[in-house]
C-alpha cells in the first residue's frame, strides 16, 4: 500500500492507495501550528492507523509547500511553521522505520496527473497551477524533476516577457512580487492576478468567479478581459513551452475550472512558439483535491 500525505498550513491529509493506484481510505486532521513533536505525532499516528487498518507496513510519501530538503537536511516551509527548519524526512524515517520521501506539493500535483491512466502515455508532463499563485512541476518518464534547489516548475516567478509588454503596453505596471522581484507572471496570471487585471482596466474590484459569471452572461467588459487574459497567458506560456517542450500540459488550481482556458488556449499558442514546435495537449487536472495525496503516494512508484 502507498500512503500519500498532502500537508498544508491548516490540514494534514492522508490517502491510502493500492497497487492499482486506487484510493482505498483517507483521513484529515488539523496541522499543529506550533510544536514539532505534536506535528511528528500527528503524522505518525495516521500512519499507525493505516498500518493497522490494512495490516501492512505501507510506504510513506509527503507533499509539502516549500523546499523539502535544504543543504543541511532541513525542511523550508513557511506555511508549516511547526516543521520548518527541522530534519523532517530523517526524523519521520527513523520513527516510522521505513523510507519516507518528501517533495514539493506542486511536484506532487504534476506526478499525480502524470500517473493518470489516460496520461501515462506521455513521456514529459508539465503541471501548471493557476490558483492563488502560479506554480507547477515537471515529470519525465514518471519521475518528478526537482532541480538542485527544488525550484523546477516555479513558473510564476518568471518575469513578463517583452511580448507581454507589447500586448499590454510598455507603461503596464510591473507589480512587486512577494519574492521581491518586479513583474513576476503570477501577479497577473493567478486567480488574484486575473481579478487585478480586471480592476486595473475597468476600475471595478471583482473576484474571479464574479468576472467569469459576467463572461458567461456575455458582458462586453468581461469578454474583453478574458480575451486579454488568455492572450497574456499564451504569451507567457509560449516562453515556458519553448524551454520545456512537454508532451502534455495539465492545468490545475481554481482557474482550471474556467473551461475557456483549456478549450481556447491551444489555438493562441502557435504564434508564440517556434515554427517547428508542436502545441502540446492541454487538459484540465483530473484528480482535484486528491491530487496532492496521490502524487505524494506515487513518489514510491518512481524507482
Swiss-Prot record:
Positions that bind ATP: 4-11, 133-140
- Pathway of action: Cell wall biogenesis; peptidoglycan recycling
Reaction catalyzed: N-acetyl-D-glucosamine + ATP = N-acetyl-D-glucosamine 6-phosphate + ADP + H(+)
What are its GO biological-process terms? N-acetylglucosamine metabolic process; peptidoglycan turnover
Output the Gene Ontology terms for molecular function: ATP binding; N-acetylglucosamine kinase activity; zinc ion binding
**Superkingdom of this protein's organism:** Bacteria
Does the UniProt entry include the keyword Cytoplasm? no
Name the Enzyme Commission number(s) assigned to this protein: 2.7.1.59
Q: Which CDD domains match?
A: ASKHA_NBD_ROK_NAGK
Positions with a binding annotation for Zn(2+): 157, 177, 179, 184
- Tell me which family the UniProt entry assigns to this protein: Belongs to the ROK (NagC/XylR) family. NagK subfamily.
Its biological purpose is as follows: Catalyzes the phosphorylation of N-acetyl-D-glucosamine (GlcNAc) derived from cell-wall degradation, yielding GlcNAc-6-P.
Protein name per the record: N-acetyl-D-glucosamine kinase
The taxonomy runs: Bacteria, Pseudomonadati, Pseudomonadota, Gammaproteobacteria, Enterobacterales
Gene name in the database record? nagK
Amino acid at each position: 500500500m502507498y500512503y500519500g500525505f498532502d500537508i498544508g498550513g491548516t490540514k494534514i491529509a492522508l490517502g491510502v492507495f493500492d497497487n492499482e493506484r486506487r484510493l482505498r481510505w483517507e483521513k484529515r486532521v488539523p496541522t499543529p501550528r506550533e510544536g514539532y513533536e505534536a506535528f511528528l505525532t500527528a503524522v505518525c499516528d495516521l500512519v499507525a492507523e493505516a498500518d493497522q487498518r490494512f495490516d501492512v507496513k505501507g510506504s510513506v510519501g509527503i507533499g509539502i509547500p516549500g523546499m523539502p530538503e535544504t543543504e543541511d537536511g532541513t525542511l523550508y516551509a513557511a506555511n508549516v511553521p511547526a516543521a520548518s527548519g527541522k530534519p523532517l524526512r530523517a526524523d519521520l524515517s527513523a520513527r516510522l522505520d521505513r523510507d519516507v520521501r518528501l517533495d514539493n506539493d506542486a511536484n506532487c500535483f504534476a506526478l499525480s496527473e502524470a500517473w493518470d491512466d489516460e496520461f501515462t502515455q506521455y513521456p514529459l508532463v508539465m503541471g501548471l497551477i493557476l490558483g492563488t499563485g502560479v506554480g507547477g512541476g515537471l515529470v519525465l518518464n514518471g519521475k518528478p524533476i526537482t532541480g538542485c534547489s527544488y525550484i523546477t516548475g516555479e513558473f510564476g516567478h518568471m518575469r513578463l516577457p517583452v511580448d507581454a509588454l507589447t500586448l499590454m503596453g510598455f507603461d503596464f505596471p510591473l507589480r512587486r512580487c512577494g519574492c521581491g522581484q518586479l513583474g513576476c507572471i503570477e501577479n497577473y496570471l493567478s486567480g488574484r492576478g486575473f481579478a487585478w487585471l480586471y480592476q486595473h482596466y475597468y476600475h471595478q474590484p471583482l473576484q474571479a468567479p464574479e468576472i467569469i459569471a459576467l463572461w458567461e452572461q456575455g458582458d462586453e467588459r468581461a469578454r474583453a478581459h478574458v480575451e486579454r487574459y488568455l492572450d497574456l497567458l499564451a504569451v507567457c506560456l509560449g516562453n515556458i513551452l519553448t524551454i520545456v517542450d512537454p508532451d502534455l500540459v495539465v492545468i490545475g488550481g481554481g482557474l482550471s475550472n474556467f473551461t475557456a482556458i483549456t478549450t481556447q488556449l491551444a489555438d493562441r499558442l502557435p504564434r508564440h512558439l517556434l515554427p517547428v514546435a508542436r502545441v502540446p495537449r492541454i487538459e484540465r487536472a483530473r484528480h482535484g483535491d486528491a491530487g496532492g495525496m496521490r502524487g505524494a503516494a506515487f513518489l514510491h512508484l518512481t524507482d
